[in-house]
Regions:
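Basic, Lys/Arg-enriched alpha-helical interface segments
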Residues: 1-67, 72-89
Length: 89
């Protein structure tokens, strides 16, 4: 279990963002993930002691470029990015 809040690609980056070659878009996803981590750490102050139900998966748009699906898991102090979709021009 982690000592501090963070985010990760779940199950791994190859599965979640593999094939997306637009590095600027990926950087925007990761920047937004950092913001979600800060928000989750403030919302779930108990972190590892949280005993409620984990929030459902949510969707976050990145400009008109694409979106990603994520889930906050308070007990593991993680924001898990499950899927990234890039709308190729």
């Amino acid at each position: 279990m982690a000592d501090a809040w963070g985010w990760e690609y779940d199950p791994d980056s190859d599965f979640v963002i593999g094939g997306i070659d637009n590095l600027a878009f990926v950087a925007k996803v990761e920047e937004r993930a950092d913001e979600l981590v800060r928000a989750a750490s403030a919302l779930y102050l108990g972190g590892t002691k949280y005993d409620g139900i984990s929030p459902l998966m949510q969707e976050e748009s990145i400009d008109a470029s694409g979106l990603f699906v994520y889930q906050v898991i308070p007990r593991h102090q993680r924001v898990c990015i499950r899927r990234v979709i890039f709308f190729a021009a």
